[in-house]
């Protein structure tokens, strides 16, 4: 079953509840940069997120350099954002809890 694309109001409602996630200019994806104390913390975060992504069968676009992980989420099958993107974003936020320095 193809995921249903969210409308602008639903996207805004989700984003209002989430810290640090930004809607792309074209409205088709959300992104966030996670910064950790060390590379090991970043890698642990990515590993935990990979397991969550597999369970959801929804995979992020991400880029890692040392302690920084840039994440972009969208649902290509829906050509935009779906509930899956926000579910995975929430799982990523949970995985990052307690791992990121307070000042970043």
UniProtKB/Swiss-Prot annotation:
EC number: 4.2.1.96
UniProt catalytic activity: (4aS,6R)-4a-hydroxy-L-erythro-5,6,7,8-tetrahydrobiopterin = (6R)-L-erythro-6,7-dihydrobiopterin + H2O
Record GO biological process: tetrahydrobiopterin biosynthetic process
GO molecular function: 4-alpha-hydroxytetrahydrobiopterin dehydratase activity
Gene3D superfamilies from the UniProt entry: Transcriptional coactivator/pterin dehydratase
Ranges annotated as spanning the membrane: none
Keywords, sorted A to Z: Lyase
Enzyme kind, highest EC tier: lyase
Annotated NCBIfam families: PRK00823.1-2 (NF002017), PRK00823.1-3 (NF002018)
Protein name: Putative pterin-4-alpha-carbinolamine dehydratase
Lineage: Bacteria, Pseudomonadati, Pseudomonadota, Alphaproteobacteria, Hyphomicrobiales
């Amino acid at each position: 079953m193809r995921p249903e694309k969210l409308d602008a109001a639903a996207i805004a409602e989700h984003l209002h509840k989430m810290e640090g996630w930004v809607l792309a200019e074209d409205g088709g994806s959300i992104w966030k940069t996670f910064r950790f104390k060390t590379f090991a913390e970043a890698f642990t975060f990515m590993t935990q997120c990979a397991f969550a992504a597999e369970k959801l069968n929804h995979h992020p676009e991400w880029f890692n350099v040392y302690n920084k992980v840039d994440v972009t989420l969208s649902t290509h099958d829906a050509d935009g954002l779906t509930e899956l993107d926000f579910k995975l974003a929430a799982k990523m936020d949970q995985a990052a809890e307690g791992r990121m320095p307070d000042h970043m």
